């Protein structure tokens, strides 16, 4: 079956429009995910800083494998 040139062009234009919509949707998701990643990185940095502060304040925990005294 030979499709007419006009039909083929219309089909390609339709596919292109759907591809443009898909690319935009994927880009929107990517931007949202990047924001989440950046927020998580900031939270991780804050937690690491807080951990360092606690270690400086209370010292490191020495875990010799012995159960705590209440056992």
Curated annotation (Swiss-Prot):
Pfam families assigned to the protein according to its UniProt record, in alphabetical order: SlyX
Q: Name the InterPro entries for this protein.
A: SlyX
- Disulphide bridges, residue numbers: none
NCBIfam families assigned to the protein according to its UniProt record, in alphabetical order: PRK00295.1
HAMAP family found in the cross-reference section = SlyX (MF_00715)
What family is this?
Answer: Belongs to the SlyX family.
The name under which this protein is listed is Protein SlyX homolog
């Amino acid at each position: 079956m030979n499709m007419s040139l006009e039909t083929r062009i219309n089909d390609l234009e339709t596919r292109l429009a759907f591809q443009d919509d898909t690319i935009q949707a994927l880009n929107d998701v990517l931007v949202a995910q990047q924001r989440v990643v950046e927020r998580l990185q900031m939270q991780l940095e804050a937690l690491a800083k807080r951990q360092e502060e606690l270690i400086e304040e209370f010292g490191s925990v020495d875990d010799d494998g012995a159960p705590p005294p209440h056992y």
